[in-house]
């Protein structure tokens, strides 16, 4: 029901107490939780040991400027860099996307973390928050990359989360700090922004993360608060059967919607399976909000613990060094 954030590199007594609550489905990790590769392995183990049930551990490890784990991990290029190669050599670009996905997912899984919220399949059309996180401004190019990225993550044993549904890339505003409104008609969205999501779903994506964007010509509320977007369009028209995550409820775009309690209820009532409460100072209010609600954490079981390879196993895998070298040759990235 809730995916919460914790404050530092070790667990406090209060955080251990939070993990006892059945409403806590897992923990999302950030740069503030990272000190070293070994420390992340230890923190992952400590989180699982502290929880009385299977716990989902997640991170944003997209590459480029959104990469929470650094030292000891491959410095992954942003997706835009891979997307730029598509015009010259589509086949090579898609192979690089597969390798990028496999490398990212393998390193995260080796650290005891279940999933990275990836890939971004928003269109790259000037949004302040998306920027070089997007493959391209062309829906069909992004769709091709979405398929390749799903395949690469799955090859590494990691579930896939497409984000940010139904598309964050065509508005200017950054929902971390401002309300974003997209006035286009549904027909336009279906022929543009929804195309990569449809491709990713068809390729077997396991989860979708919602956008904190309002599309007033489709529904009056932000997409994550909208049963029309989640139940009618995503699950109904598009046939998605996986897990639906909210984006972080600490963002300014949704902060004014009834406070933490109102925001949590709005997401769950609309059909989100899991609400992200990334700021520890909001966790107590979020837990109060869900007290008495029936827990639906069973929806996440398929995302948790698909077998942890461990770093020794990954470093011994010949694919690891080969893919690292290939990406380094193309983009000048390394550990």
Curated annotation (Swiss-Prot):
It holds the Pfam family Glyco_hydro_3. Transmembrane segments: none annotated. GO terms for biological process: carbohydrate metabolic process; cell division; cell wall organization; peptidoglycan biosynthetic process; peptidoglycan turnover; regulation of cell shape. Its main location: cytoplasm. It catalyses: Hydrolysis of terminal non-reducing N-acetyl-D-hexosamine residues in N-acetyl-beta-D-hexosaminides. InterPro entries: Beta_hexosaminidase_bac, Glyco_hydro_3_AS, Glyco_hydro_3_N, Glyco_hydro_3_N_sf, Glycoside_hydrolase_SF, NagZ_Beta-hexosaminidase. PROSITE patterns: GLYCOSYL_HYDROL_F3 (PS00775). Keywords: Cell cycle, Cell division, Cell shape, Cell wall biogenesis/degradation, Cytoplasm, Glycosidase, Hydrolase, Peptidoglycan synthesis. It is found in: Cytoplasm. Pathway: Cell wall biogenesis; peptidoglycan recycling. Its EC number is 3.2.1.52. Substrate binds at residues 60, 68, 133, 163-164. It is an enzyme of class 3 (hydrolase). NCBIfam families: PRK05337.1. Plays a role in peptidoglycan recycling by cleaving the terminal beta-1,4-linked N-acetylglucosamine (GlcNAc) from peptide-linked peptidoglycan fragments, giving rise to free GlcNAc, anhydro-N-acetylmuramic acid and anhydro-N-acetylmuramic acid-linked peptides. Belongs to the glycosyl hydrolase 3 family. NagZ subfamily. This is Beta-hexosaminidase.
